Amino acid sequence: MSVYRVLPSGRQVRTVDTRKGWAAIHVMAGGQWEVTRRGKRLGAGSVWNSDTAEAKRRAESFLANIIETEG
């Protein structure tokens, strides 16, 4: 199970150690998600039904694909 910290703004953040440095998964209210590394956005999106659990799954899947392609 993934551990997300909840910031005072309500944003949920999880950090992941990758070969090219730390990446962060941000999940916001309304089902929006964003993946960043070193302050740069790698990708972002949202789910139609505002489901934060689904947003987490999509963000984690997105980051897993990036890690896999980096070799």
Please tell me what each predicted stretch does.
Residues R38-E54:
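A short, exposed loop/beta-hairpin motif centered on an aromatic-Gly-Thr core
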Residues M1-E34:
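Short N-terminal "domain-start" leader segments
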Residues M1-V3, A64-G71:
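Short intrinsically disordered terminal tails
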Residues D17-K20, R38, E54, E68-G71:
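Serine/threonine-rich, low-complexity intrinsically disordered segments
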Residues V16, A29, W48-S50, A64:
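Intrinsic-disorder/low-complexity regions
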Residues E60-S61:
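Short, compact, well-ordered microdomains
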